[in-house]
Amino acid sequence: MKVCLVGSSGGHLTHLYMLKPFWQDQDRFWVTFPKPDAQSLLVDETMIPCYYPTNRSLKALLINTRLAWKVLRKERPDLIISTGAAVAVPFFYLGKLLGAKTMYIEIFDRIDSPTLTGKLVYPVTDRFIVQWEELKRVYPKAINLGSIF
């Protein structure tokens, strides 16, 4: 199985990295910001840099949508996993169009309110994971797996 792990650097990337027992034996590639923390964490991984900053930026959305189209058509992942943030949105929507399964994990510090990215990708996510039972009120089809820490 080929896996695309997409997320912002910092805490979002740390959450994805903590899933190592799942992805370590998979054919995989990462999409994240080309920042020092990401580059040092993913030194032995295939990392595709995306455009940032992405916070509610139409320019970033357009650039990263073009990147997602190019990358997803070339790599053809079976599964796209993200913990956010905005860079995940075009990868999830275009990934679904290209037949990929999607899994979104709402970030740990969201206990009872959704992230913008979570709200945007929820409609196209095959498995939506929350880490707090309270978030199931916001995301009824979510699965609460508890903390990934």
Placement of each model-derived feature along the sequence:
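Short, conserved loop/helix-junction motifs that constitute active-site signature segments
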Residues: 20-25, 121-122
